[in-house]
Structure formats: C-alpha cells, structure tokens
Amino acid sequence: MTDVTVKALAAEIQTSVDRLVQQFADAGIPKSADDSVSAQEKQTLLAHLNRENGSGPDKLTLQRKTRSTLNIPGTGGKSKSVQIEVRKKRTFVKRDPQETERLAAEEQAQREAEEQARREAEETAKREAQQKADREAAEQAKRDAAEKAKREAAEKDKVSNQQTDDMTKTAQAEKARRENEAAELKRKAEEEARRKLEEEARRVAEEARRMAEENKWTDNAEPTEDTSDYHVTTSQHARQAEDENDREVEGGRGRSRNAKAARPAKKGNKHSESKADREEARAAVRGGKGGKNRKGSALQQSFQKPVQAVNRDVVIGETITVGELANKMAVKGSQVIKAMMKLGAMATINQVIDQETAQLVAEEMGHKVILRRENELEEAVMSDRDTGAAAEPRAPVVTIMGHVDHGKTSLLDYIRSTKVASGEAGGITQHIGAYHVETDNGMITFLDTPGHAAFTSMRARGAQATDIVVLVVAADDGVMPQTIEAIQHAKAAGVPVVVAVNKIDKPEADPDRVKNELSQYGILPEEWGGESQFVHVSAKAGTGIDELLDAILLQAEVLELKAVRKGMASGAVIESFLDKGRGPVATVLVREGTLNKGDIVLCGFEYGRVRAMRNELGQEVLEAGPSIPVEILGLSGVPAAGDEVTVVRDEKKAREVALYRQGKFREVKLARQQKSKLENMFANMTEGEVHEVNIVLKADVQGSVEAISDSLLKLSTDEVKVKIIGSGVGGITETDATLAAASNAILVGFNVRADASARKVIEAESLDLRYYSVIYNLIDEVKAAMSGMLSPELKQQIIGLAEVRDVFKSPKFGAVAGCMVTEGTIKRHNPIRVLRDNVVIYEGELESLRRFKDDVNEVRNGMECGIGVKNYNDVRVGDMIEVFEIIEIQRTIA
C-alpha cells in the first residue's frame, strides 16, 4: 500500500488534522501534518482506537407484545371477549472471534461425539439382535434334531409293527401328521419372534439417532420467533386434544363392548358390573349409540328444554326497546315483533316503545307487568331540600310587553335612568333584559321582552315568570299584532295587565282610540267598569312615570305577593348564553329562598356549583333573594331558557338527575318519531322534488337561537324548505364549519363571530358565511336565498293580432294568409294561435312572414303582410291570428 501523509489521511477519514495528530501521539507514534503514514502505523492506530472507544454493544434485547381478542362462549348464547397479551423477549449476544471459534470447535466435537455414540448404539443394537437371533437359531436346530430323531424312531417302530397291526399304523400316521403340524406352527412362531426382535433393534437404533439429532438442533440452532397466530394454535391444540379424548373414549367403549361379547361378566364380580354400568351411563350422556353424536360428545349438556311456558314478572320503565323487552321475558325478539304485529304495531328490534305498548305486549304474551317510576331519584333529590316555613312579602316581577317600536325599552330606560336601548342593534330589543329598580315605595323587578314577531316564545316565557304585565301601546299607533299577542300571553298566564299608553306627548296621540281598540280584546279600563289600570306616559319627557310605578305597586299590593326568603333557592332561567371567557352563563330569576355563591344547582339537563353571581350592572354579589335577577356562572352547559333552577344538597345526585333527564329526553324523542305509515309513503316520494335551504345557526344567547329558528322554519313553502342543520350558543367553531361544508349549508352568525380555525375551514371550503346583528336583515336575506330556488313562473304575453283578409296558395308553404295587422306587432318565429269565431282551433309557430314578396322579421300595426303557418293549411278568410311570447317571471316569497 502506498504511504499517505497525515493531512491526506485526515481528509480521507473526514476529521481534523490536529485531532488525527493527537490520536497518533496517544498511540505512541509522533507525527506532524506533513509526515507520511505507513500501513503498519494505520493498523496500530486502529487497534489503539478500538481499545479506547470499545466496540458496539455486546448484547441486544428485543421485546415484542402481541395483543388479540379471544371470544369465549358463555351462558345464554352470549359470548364475551377476553383481551390477551403475549409478551416475547429475545436476547442476542455478540461474541468475539476467538470465542466464536472456540464454540464452533466445541460444537463440532460434540457433534462428532454424538455421531460416534449413535454409531456405537446402532452397532450394539445390531450385535445384540444378531446374538439373540443366533441363540434362537441354535435352539431351533437342537429342537429340529431331536424332533428328527424322534420321527425316525417312530418310523422304525411303525415299520416293525406294520405287519402286526394295521389299525395301529393308521393311528401312528395320524399322530405323526399332528406332530408335523405342531412343529410347523412352532417354527413359524419362532420366526415371528425373531422378526419382532429385529424390528425392535431397528426401532431402538432409529430412536437413538433421532434423539441425537434433536439434541444437536436444540443445542446449536437459534430459537426462532413463533409467527403463528396464538389463537389459531390454541384452537388447533384444543381440537387435537378433544379428538384424542374422543378416540380414547371410543376405544375404551369398543374394547369394553368386545370384552362383553367375548365373555359374559361374572355375576359375583361387583367391580366389573359397576364398570360396565359406568360405561353405559357415560355413553348415554354423550349421545347414545348414534354415530354422528359421538364426535364431541364429551362437551354436550344434559339440559332439557322446559315444556311449560314460564310466566315472569317483567319490570317496564317509561320507555324500553323491543330487544330489552324480549330479554326481560326470556324470548326471542322475533316473537315480540310478531306479537306487536298482531296488535297492529310495526316495530324493529332496536325501536324504542312507550310503557303502555310494552305493557300490552307483555300481558298478551302471558307475563305479569310491574310498572316502574323512573323519576324516583329526581323526586328524592327534590324532596331533600331546606325550605323555610315563614313567607314574607316580596317585590313584584313586572314584564313590559307590547309591539315593536312602541317604546318599551325606552320607558324602562327612563325608569332606570340609563341608556340601554342605544346599545341594542337596530334600536330594537332582541334579548330578555332583567333589572330590579329601587323606588320610594319599594323594589320592582322588570323583565323587558322583545316586541318583534320572531320572539313569540321569549314573550311567552316572560309572561309565565311574571306577576304583572305592563302593556305598552303607542298612542299614535294603536293596537298592533304583537300587542294582541301580548294580551293573549297575559291571559294564558292569568296575569293582571296595567296599560301604559306611551308617546302621549305627540300631537297625533289618541288615547281614547287605544282604549276602544283594547276593549275589543277584553282589556277594559277601570273607569269603564273593567279591572285594568290605564296610565298615560311619555318615555321621552318622563310624563306619568311615577303614576305608572304607583299603579304597579298598587296592583302588587292587591295580589299580596309573598315568598319564603330563607332556605334553598328555586327559580327560572330567563336567558342563557355561552361566554368565551366565562363559559355557560344563565340569567336566573329567583322565586323562593336565597341563592348563595357556592350553592349546587340543578338546571334542566345541566348542573353545577355557582362559582360567581353578578347583578344586571355587572357587579359581583354573594346572594340573591326572591324576585332578584342574577347571572350565575359554573354550570356544566348552557341550559334552555325557561328551565327550572333548583338548589340541591349533593352534587353527585344532581349530576345523576341531569344525566337521567338527558337520557329520558333522548328516549322520549326517539319514541315520538313518526312511525312508518302508508299515508307518509306518498309524502316521502315527493320530497326529492322539494328544494332545501340548509342553515347552520349560531347566536349569542339561547333565546335568539330559538326565535330565529322558529322564524326561519315558518318561511318554508311547498317548493322550498328551510332546514336548520345545526344550532347553538357561542361563536362559530371549526365543527360548525365542517358541518356546514358536509351538508352544503349557509353559516349564519347572529351577534357572534368565527374563530381562527373555523375561518381556515370556511376559506378552504369556500363556505357562505353571513353575520347579522338585526333579525330583520337575517330573515330578509334568507327569503331572498329561498326566492332564488323557486322555479320561475311562465307567463304568455300577446304581442300582436292579425286578421285574415284573403288566402293564397304557395308551392313552398301551402296556404298563405294575407292579413292586416290590427293590434301590436307580428314577429317571425314566435308561437301563434289561430282563432275562428273567438275559439282557438290551432296553436303552432309562425314560419314565414312577408311584405310585398320580401321576407321581414316583424310587421307593425296597420300594415298588410303574408303569414305562413307551420304545418297548417286550413286558414280561412275572417280568422284571427294571435302572436304571443312566453316570458319568465321570477317569484319571491312574501
């Protein structure tokens, strides 16, 4: 090998020159950068580096886990799954070359020793077999010689005595023949014994050779990984063991049967009798004498199916599935379905049925029914509450209702001396506002409801939670639709009404007109003999505000409103929404008791501990008494507006009740699903022709979601339907955007915005996202989108009328009508009608239009022309030709 310099070697092995010089110095070879390096010096350096750094790892351990599932059959035809984990570990040891050579030499020596032992064993076996065969042959030869001498002596005796006695000779011949046969049989037996000995010797030698080979493979071969499936191998072993067991049983049975046939058992032998009896009993249990039943007979049961029907006590809750009912009655689901079909009800095995239907089916099938009350836990939680006995007077809860823009919020705004209305989008109220006001005569709690038509359900909730309704009517506008609706809500809730005639300061105000209109709906003023107080007010000027408050307090005094102030609180959710920083927030109006910070509350489907309470001004409060509205934080989710709020003792039980209510709501919803009836079949067949506007709706509060959903669903027509794919409270999330993309829906955000992840999905999928803050605009735009889906209306518009004055014959067009245009314009290639005595006799197309032998496109009023009608020759003088065109009119939703 050619010597290289230290610098070149460093470049070749990709290391620095200084490091390589240092390594040479450590190895005892002083070098500089320009010195040459020989092959011997390279080997010396390599050996030094190996000693310093060592080699790779001497031992490597591999671990492997295999997880699988084994299905084990259980009782009742059900099977359970067992998780099985097989762990394998293998260690590889790296040996040095000297150790490897030594082990190879030892293995070679061991193999040679085993081969020598095998050969010696074979030689020994052969030698023993040969010696035994020689001994047998020598003994046989001696026996043959003795037999021969005996035969010769017998023959001599026979010859000597032949003349004397023929009868003796015959007997001797017979005897000799028998002796020959016995000798032949004996010889054959000896040969068979010798053959068996030789086979035994060969078998011993083969066994020795096989054991030697197994030892060799066991000692030398590396253990291989078991790649077979654990469960397949296990089941194969199980089947083999079962087959061997069956073969042993069959063999024992056959042997016992043959033994019985060969020799009858002794009467006095009790052991043999008991053994035979056991065999017979075992055979009877395992399937008798049938040949097919013998296989696997050891695993069969001796259970006999009961012949009589078993009547059971079946416990049925409020709802139950068909499959669960079948399990409780211990019958197959198909039998329950058949019984329901006999009763006239169609059902599937997973369908939820109500308690009455399940009771009828169970009683029809002969079982006793026990009806279970599932709300026992809920009743127990509700009964375990501290409620004080002494009731005290409380402040009235007043709901301000009326038509939109009649000044409800402005009136309350003046009372509270704040500017709330300016903060509402569009100047209209879209939430329920709850406020309490301290006056000189006492405290009053006000609920401000929306007046827009979309917020019917909100107004209904406000009327149910209130004591007194203040009906605001504009003096210049009179009674309007939402005013009438507010009267209906108040009457339905049985709440007294105080009428505030607002905008009394306007010149066009007419309070008497308002009284007359309200009297038509059962609201009569006191001066007319009615029960309602009428107060003239002006929210702008502040006129009559004190009189209105006095009227409210007077009405409250008449009602004698009282509530328990001490003890656990109960109330109602006025409004709820999801705040990004604070979580679910609910506006609660306390009816009884005192709500404290830290109380555990149960609220519809939700529960939680009150972590914080704020009043309507956003100030933290520690407690809230009757008729006080507060915002509470800490619920598990956003409750539905109108839900009952109850303080309970145990959070665990509150959670159980909330989960039970959720499950019950879901089951009831499934049970109410429409059954497949014949009349629905035709309705479903036409659904494919209906266009759908899919909407994913998110709003800031629960009430707005409810109101907008109701308003949009009411827009549906026979041709276009609005479908709310998803709705909720809070900002637009990625999940909402994905849902809208999957269902081809419009994303609508009412006073909410989309987060960053949702915006990415919206941009990627090019979704239609729209933000609104006023409900008018939202409804108008959805109407416009629905109008675009309506098929246009086709309308025929008459553009010209011509009278036939003469008829000419043309070789090209046939009959050509010479006409005078009497109305409008005649256009070529337009559809026409031929009228005779004002009766349409033909409808077709105008093919040829000429004026003085020239083809023209149109002929105006008062001019003559020739008209050729396509595929029609029966034109007569006096006929009228009506030319029209079809125009499309875009339809809109009113």
UniProtKB/Swiss-Prot annotation:
One of its GO terms (cellular component) is cytosol. Residues 448-451 are annotated as: G3. Residues 68-82 have a biased composition (Polar residues). Residues 402-409 are annotated as: G1. GTP binds at residues 402-409, 448-452, 502-505. InterPro entries: DNA-bd_dom_put_sf, EF-G-like_DII, EFTu-like_2, IF2_assoc_dom_bac, IF2_II, IF2_N, P-loop_NTPase, Small_GTP-bd. Transmembrane segments: none annotated. It is found in: Cytoplasm. Residues 93-159, 166-219, 270-283 have a biased composition (Basic and acidic residues). Its main location: cytoplasm. Residues 427-431 are annotated as: G2. This is Translation initiation factor IF-2. The gene is infB.
